[in-house]
Curated annotation (Swiss-Prot):
Intracellular or extracellular location(s): Secreted, Extracellular space, Apoplast
Gene3D superfamilies: Jelly Rolls
Protein name: Germin-like protein subfamily 1 member 4
CDD domains for this protein: cupin_OxOx (cd02241)
Keyword Secreted applies: yes
Chief place where the protein resides: secreted
Key words, A-Z: Apoplast, Disulfide bond, Glycoprotein, Manganese, Metal-binding, Secreted, Signal
One annotated GO molecular function: manganese ion binding
Superkingdom per UniProt: Eukaryota
Residues annotated as domain Cupin type-1: 64-215
Pfam families (UniProt xref): Cupin_1
Functional description taken from the UniProt entry: May play a role in plant defense. Probably has no oxalate oxidase activity even if the active site is conserved.
Subunit-level organization: Oligomer (believed to be a pentamer but probably hexamer).
């Protein structure tokens, strides 16, 4: 079983890499690589300055640590460990990302979107209930599935989705996506915890809620 999961993980990463070159949402690079750097005297590409190619090393394309479980004690019982440009500078301009998700029993990654990239899940351990909602063009259709180790599920770019551990043990997922920085908008935080807060009267009317309930939700999320 472990060998099968490793094979599936490798396949997902290869598919994510292949799709990034064909249907990449990030700008297509005009050079082999643009390793991100904090130095500001280089070329600026895709939100980062490029390291001098002559000073690029193997370690610019390497990182470790996805074998370490995330802390699920705080929050809703879910934690993601993201490999981004800060952690892996060689990701810049390549149009891919990878992350580890850890879920405590009953843990939840609340409804959210990734505005700049799609996402694909490979369950390594546990039992997850996942789903996404289509846009108004498709009548806000809800698609859900219960996932087990070895199962793969894809979430289209920009659509609201969620992940919940419905098993009795911890759950682990490896996630890959089609952007080096897909972004993340948690719906509740954005609507009720914006800075500054949205006028409660607007939200009360939009969601058919009592004004005081809106004020309560804003206090919870802000």
């Amino acid at each position: 079983m472990e060998g099968l999961l490793q094979f599936l993980l490798a396949k997902i990463i290869l598919l994510a890499l292949a799709s990034s070159f064909v249907y990449c949402y990030d700008p297509s690079p005009l050079q082999d690589y643009c390793v991100a750097t904090n130095e500001t005297n280089g070329v600026y590409v895709n939100g980062e300055f490029c390291k001098d190619p002559k000073r690029v090393t193997t370690n610019d394309f390497y990182t470790s640590g996805l074998n370490v479980p995330g802390n699920t004690i705080i929050g809703p019982g879910a934690r993601n460990t993201v490999v981004d440009v800060e952690r892996l500078p060689g990701l810049n301009t390549l149009g891919v990302d990878i992350a580890r998700y850890d879920f405590a029993p009953g843990g939840l990654d609340p409804p959210h979107t990734h505005p700049r990239g799609s996402q694909i899940f490979l369950v390594m351990k546990g039992k997850l209930f996942v789903g996404f909602v289509s846009s108004n063009e498709y009548n806000y259709t809800l698609f859900t599935k219960v996932l087990y180790p070895g199962d793969v599920f894809v979430f289209p770019k920009g659509l609201i989705h969620f992940h919940a551990n419905i098993g009795e043990t911890n759950a682990v997922v490896i996630s890959a996506g089609g952007s080096q920085d897909p972004g993340r908008i948690i719906i509740g935080d954005a609507v009720f915890g914006s800075k500054p807060l949205i006028d409660p009267k607007v939200l009360a009317k939009a969601f058919a809620l009592d004004y005081n309930k809106v004020k309560y939700l804003q206090a919870v999320f802000s």
